Amino acid sequence: MIQHHLVLDTPSLLALSGNRQVSALIHQAHLDADTRLWVPVLSAIEADVVLAGIAEHIGQLDVIHMLDLDYPAVLAVAQMCRDGVPTGVAAAVHAARHLPEWGSQALVATVEPKAYEGQGVGVFDLNR
């Protein structure tokens, strides 16, 4: 049974190119079947706009599980965005709250933990 569910957000995806903690997390997930990494599609798109090719790169990593948006998710993320939450943060918040595995709880793994203050999700700070 998977014990650790972590949602990677846009800043964490962008940090893959040089942040040791993010790289170590990817490596750890490869070695540990109890850790599952999730990436919201919107976060991957947002990261690829900034760093072309990152979406293709993360799509090739076996330990990354992409999260699509269904209609209720689109509405929830859109509402958060209208409330001033950045798109990638909103997508990660929704993903952490609604993993496709029943009964699962997830943390958002991020290099920008302050973005999640007041969002009602747990955060795994990749700066430590």
Question: Which role does the model predict for each range below?
Answer:
Residues 66-113:
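Active-site neighborhoods of divalent-metal-dependent phosphate/nucleic-acid chemistry enzymes
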